[in-house]
Amino acid sequence: GHKRFCMWRDCQCKKCSLIAERQRVMAAQVALRRQQAQEEELGISHPIPLPSAPKLFVKKENNGGSSCLLLESSSPTHSTNTATTASTTPSEGRMLIQDIPSITSRGHLESTSDLVVDSTYYSSFYQPSLYPYYNNLYNYSQYQMAVASDSSSSDMGGTLAGSPVKNSLRSLPATYMSSQSGNQWQMKSTESRHAMSSQYRMHSY
């Protein structure tokens, strides 16, 4: 009978004090989560972590410049004065080509580590359980584009530039469906579009 008639917030017995303490801890956890969510929202538009990437670019470019200078100074020892200009320019070009991908890859990795929070934040907006047909429409549009560009690349005659494009585009729609059932997919997508629009109207009001 104590449980039914007791005000557990004001009661001093062991059981009620434990319940009150647990409620306080849960409220503190909820407050912490809200604060973290607000900090993440502010962190999206916060410009503080961004300048670290340009600094890396500058450092990497400086390193690349010094290595080019080293190559220029070492190349005249191996060749004559007439061949120095010919030997230094290709080494410069090669060093720059080698340095540029490493710069972009490093900057990309650091920027993605900053953007991991953003992806989780944006994923909370999109709920695929409410609109199960919405994802199919996006897949269908990508598949349609891939088929169009695939046919255009095959018209090129299988050139060197067209073949990697073909392979990359073919791997993209392969996860969604096979190319044989294209007409069936088209029928399904039109039906799902109607169903999605009616469902979307129901939810929007």
UniProtKB/Swiss-Prot annotation:
Record key words, sorted: Developmental protein, Differentiation, DNA-binding, Metal-binding, Nucleus, Sexual differentiation, Transcription, Transcription regulation, Zinc
GO cellular component: nucleus
InterPro entries according to UniProt: DM_DNA-bd, DM_DNA-bd_sf, DMRT, DMRT1-like
UniProt key word Membrane: no
UniProt record, GO biological process: cell differentiation; sex differentiation
Record Pfam families: DM (PF00751), Dmrt1 (PF12374)
Region (Disordered): 180-205
Leader sequence segment: none
Record's subcellular location: Nucleus
Main subcellular location: nucleus
Top-level division of the source organism's lineage: Eukaryota
DNA-binding feature ranges: 1-29
Gene Ontology molecular function: DNA-binding transcription factor activity, RNA polymerase II-specific; metal ion binding; RNA polymerase II cis-regulatory region sequence-specific DNA binding
Role according to the record: May be required for testis development.
Family: Belongs to the DMRT family.
Protein name listed in UniProt: Doublesex- and mab-3-related transcription factor 1
Organism: Trachemys scripta (Red-eared slider turtle)
Upper lineage: Eukaryota, Metazoa, Chordata, Craniata, Vertebrata
Gene (UniProt): DMRT1
